[in-house]
Amino acid sequence: MLTFISKAQQIPITSQPLSNAYLYNPAAAGVQGYIDITLGGRQQWTGIENAPRTYYLYANSALGKNSGKDFSYLSLPVSNPGYYNQLAQSKPKVKHAIGGRVFADSYGAFSESGIGVDYAIHLPLKEKLYLSFGLGLQASNFYFDRSKAQVLDAFDPSYDQFLSGKESELLFNGRFGAYIYTDKLRIGYSINQLVQNSLTGETSASAYQGQKIHQFGNVSYRFDLNKIGLTPSAAILFAPHSPLSIYGGLIFDYNRLFLISAAYRNDESIVFGIGFTALKIFRLSYTYDFPMGDVQKVSSGSHELLLKVMLNRKNASDE
């Protein structure tokens, strides 16, 4: 029981990392050209008792309008008073963004629920090219359900000491991220769980029970071919004492309304997805992870459903 948790990823895994960039990286807040409200859920390894389940809700948006200051006082009365305003508005400006998230994650006898807030600043490097930095704070409640614990050795002193700890414990943590982006390119890197908290009752035999730093990186680029869009992407998640998670995928969409996707994850699973956009503000997408290798013998796969609401979306190219 303790071994399983010690070697598991401690932040949720998603099969839609491109749509869920903010879930991993606070610097992704405000990258989209709209107010992004996302609700998602994932059932992993269907068919396995007490398999991981994840639910999340988050929202993020840039603040204010991307407009310049009033420079008309620099113009002589006989000239064009609006010239300097037009010039100022044509230049990219520093942007600020905020975001918030709630989540619930369960895996076997352990569950975690939490809430987080994030801030990001977006610095213009050149026209349409931005570099953003983000910081986030998070409060998480960890719960251990003794009734679901399966122990091979009931007289294990490490397990007895772990049981002497709290069933429920509140921990605080933080995260940091950076993002480079244009209207087509996305490159991100983030560090989650900056504080390596320990759980009460943790022993040297369960040294990885506490929160560990998780590093996440992603890259994607969109190619527009008339009404057809092709977006190859890759993501990597690294955590101490856990297998390296590598994701590579391709999204095909028509007129940004309908999409299909395929991806491969190095944990021996192939991912297939479909999605559509309705009324220009709602996007519903579903992915199925087809297991391969030994997992296929005990699981029928993983399912993930995501609903995105895109408010104040100026045009269809805002992604």
Language model: regions and residue ranges:
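Sec/Tat signal peptide C-region and signal peptidase I cleavage site
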Residues: 4-8
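Subset of outer-membrane beta-barrel
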Residues: 9-319
